[in-house]
Amino acid sequence: SMLYAIGIACVKYSKFSYLNTLFHLMLPEYSSPDSSGRIYFLNKLHPCYWDKDDLNQLNGTNYKTPLSTILSKQLRPYFQKEIFLESEYISTFCIFEYLLSLNFKHIGGLSYAPDWAPWGEFRWRTMIFMRGNNDLYSTFFAQAESQKNNWEPIKQGMFDGKYEVYKKLKTKIQTSTSTAH
């Protein structure tokens, strides 16, 4: 939950360079000078790391994204003073998870499942966001399309500071999450 707490705060306060650094952390025991054994933190900790059915069974729930939903509910009280509206919190949470998914794909993903990327609440909430109007989530990612290399996450170094890298990753993520079960 620490990853998520830091991530939500980074999104809320537009600290994307910090978030980028967090996403690129490596596990020390796997670090090697020639980068052949590089294992990124995100490869071991993401919202799909644990089996959905096992988590639901343990918690007596039937969530589409159990870890994401549990973390969202668990962390909400800590952001009450900074994020007043529930809708803003949910949007901020989903922005973080989508950025996590994009960055997971960007740093290399899983060698044995190159087309896969983790997904969270953003996967099923996107349709809800699209039906509403003036929501933070849709606006945030629409800014990428209009601002391109001037979009704040890109300006702060995410996606190698290039809109084209982001756009390719976004297409890959949309493909992988639309075919995920």
Outline where the language-model segments fall.
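Charge-rich interaction segments
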Residues: 1-7
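Short coil/turn connectors between adjacent alpha-helices in alpha-solenoid helical repeat scaffolds
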Residues: 7-17, 58
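Charge-dense, extended regions
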Residues: 18-181
